[in-house]
Amino acid sequence: MSSISLKENGGEVSVKKDYSNGGGVRDLYGEDSATEDHLITPWTFSVASGCSLLRDPRYNKGLAFTEGERDAHYLRGLLPPSVFNQELQEKRLMHNLRQYEVPLHRYMALMDLQERNERLFYKLLIDNVAELLPVVYTPTVGEACQKYGSIFRRPQGLYISLKEKGKILEVLKNWPEKSIQVIVVTDGERILGLGDLGCQGMGIPVGKLSLYTALGGVRPSSCLPVTIDVGTNNEKLLNDEFYIGLRQRRATGQEYATFLDEFMRAVKQNYGEKVLVQFEDFANHNAFDLLEKYSSSHLVFNDDIQGTASVVLAGLLASLKLVGGTLADHTFLFLGAGEAGTGIAELIAVEVSKQTKAPVEETRKKIWLVDSKGLIVSSRLESLQQFKKPWAHEHEPVKGLLEAVKAIKPTVLIGSSGAGKTFTKEVVETMASLNEKPLILALSNPTSQSECTAEEAYTWSKGRAIFASGSPFDPVEYEGKLFVPGQANNAYIFPGFGLGLIMSGAIRVRDEMLLAASEALAAQVSEENYDKGLIYPPFTNIRKISANIAAKVAAKAYDLGLASHLKRPKDLVKYAESCMYSPGYRSYR
């Protein structure tokens, strides 16, 4: 005999085994004998026990299953006999991670962990945030996106391509989780400072949402990473046999706008008015248009424009204790007039307007921007993109950054250009000659694209610069003094900002909320931090920081009448802390 027969006997199924076919068993469902042309049914069973429990990252605890749980859930023999607690598992994993010398290998190991044991992944990230943040996000995530086609294992988010035009609502319904509160979406056109990575930009939404959970306490099941694939103009990817996206040039114009509009309408229809949609790494020309178009009808947030602006403003507010004066006393010069540069500039102008009661049009006049063609001045007005026009001030044309520094005499120099090594020795020395304590922010990511390094800023300014960067740099010793460079990382703001919107049930984002987040972050900088030259608090207290930011954002939502969760909690900080996801293991019956 060479088959298994199933017979019903009094309502029960009995199995007659047949091992005559080489010790094997009969292919009951036809999978083994099926050809590609032969359709089969993909049977699945959803009983959370045995192997299925071990393979479900939401419930798997690995060696932390207790003796009782192993008996109750048919795990005997499927695990080694030792029982570890979560702390020992964490210790073992951190030991293993530290053996990897290549950051990308650490990234891949962490993504593997996330796919097999969700709670242990977040426990690891929360407890070791300063060490692991550069791995799960900038700068390592940039390299991961560049090589995403080669290291791709399994989908971690939702891919919506032009193939799904007219069916986006159906695609959203394919996602297994239904109570979505935060969506991070990219079209992959401007990934960090790396350019068009197309569909491989998925690493950015995945990384951002892991930080929403680890740093802001938003439940993983409430987060949805989305990549909108409208093609890519990256010839290298189009010719790469391992590229995982559409092999066509990018859709533009009306086709692009219609597709994005279908996505936004489907999101609102499927998840409701209060789902937060965070636009991530869109090209400048689309980022501003999308934010302007949907800010009045959806709960939308652009981290590159608004998140960066909020975290930089927080650093500027904190730095006043070191450099003196008020924000209105300073003159700002930006290298880079894209999403980040203009977004930061506008929020600074709004904050100065709030402090001085002067019109925003007036407060913009002490903020100057340099783009690829030089200083943005009124004589260039006709040729400027719309979002640059508010920054075209009266001044003779100036071509280079060094010439602009000499002409404008800024007290604050901010780089958001995505062009590395542009804060040259001459530029930094000129800033130091103009100011006792020049404030220099080199914000571009990843590290290779930073306008200057921390060591260069401190050395060229003879230890007088107040420095912060977008990517992490090691502490620098200069003439016997240790300088700890701050990182103007958006991760300070967006997790707490998102939590504040969620816990208040906010239906729209307003500038007042961004200002509240900046002020809350600046207030967390301690005297000890200032003594080290820091203008940002350490990441070790990030959940406390996020709770305070969330409370201020929620309070502003209630004040503006934009909160839908009534009634208002008395202690918003405690309420924020109570809303946060905890990654500790749960006990199973």
Swiss-Prot record:
Induction: By fungal elicitor. InterPro entries: Aminoacid_DH-like_N_sf, Malic_enzyme_CS, Malic_N_dom, Malic_N_dom_sf, Malic_NAD-bd, Malic_OxRdtase, NAD(P)-bd_dom_sf. NAD(+) binds at residues 190, 304, 445. GO terms for molecular function: malate dehydrogenase (decarboxylating) (NADP+) activity; metal ion binding; NAD binding; oxaloacetate decarboxylase activity. It holds the Pfam family Malic_M. Its cofactor is Mg(2+); Mn(2+). Its EC number is 1.1.1.40. The record marks 304 as: Important for activity. It catalyses: (S)-malate + NADP(+) = pyruvate + CO2 + NADPH; oxaloacetate + H(+) = pyruvate + CO2. The active site is at 137 (proton donor), 208 (proton acceptor). NADP(+) binds at residues 333-349. One of its GO terms (cellular component) is chloroplast. Belongs to the malic enzymes family. Homotetramer. This is NADP-dependent malic enzyme. It comes from Phaseolus vulgaris. The lineage of its organism: Eukaryota, Viridiplantae, Streptophyta, Embryophyta, Tracheophyta.
